[in-house]
């Protein structure tokens, strides 16, 4: 199937609108805050990865800093989930815009589907 320039401009416009919609929803509805315990663990691990580390030392009073789905083991604290998503999210953390990762991935997915 041969696609003309109008098609690609249309896809580009839809992707741009999707990116803007995701950015507005992230800002106005979700307020750039993780809303589930899973998300908190992902953001924690992404912040650790953004420091070029795999784990951080456990705080002295670890019970006061308990976080669901974050593991304290042998004096180290790390997320319990696979590192793929936190590693991608760490790129956004380094840019001080973690919301950008979801917006770009959503837009890329939309473009690939078209």
Describe each PLM feature range:
Residues 99-114:
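Transmembrane-helix motifs of polytopic, lipid-linked glycan transferases
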């Amino acid at each position: 199937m041969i696609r003309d320039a109008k098609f690609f401009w249309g896809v580009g416009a839809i992707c741009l609108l999707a990116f803007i919609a995701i950015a507005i929803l992230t800002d106005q509805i979700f307020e750039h805050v993780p809303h589930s315990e899973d998300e908190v663990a992902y953001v924690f691990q992404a912040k650790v990865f953004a420091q070029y580390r795999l784990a951080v030392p456990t705080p002295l009073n670890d019970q006061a800093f308990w976080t669901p789905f974050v593991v304290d083991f042998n004096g180290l604290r790390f997320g319990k989930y696979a590192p793929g998503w936190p590693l991608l999210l760490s790129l956004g953390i380094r840019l001080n815009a973690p919301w950008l990762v979801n917006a770009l991935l959503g837009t890329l997915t939309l473009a690939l589907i078209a």
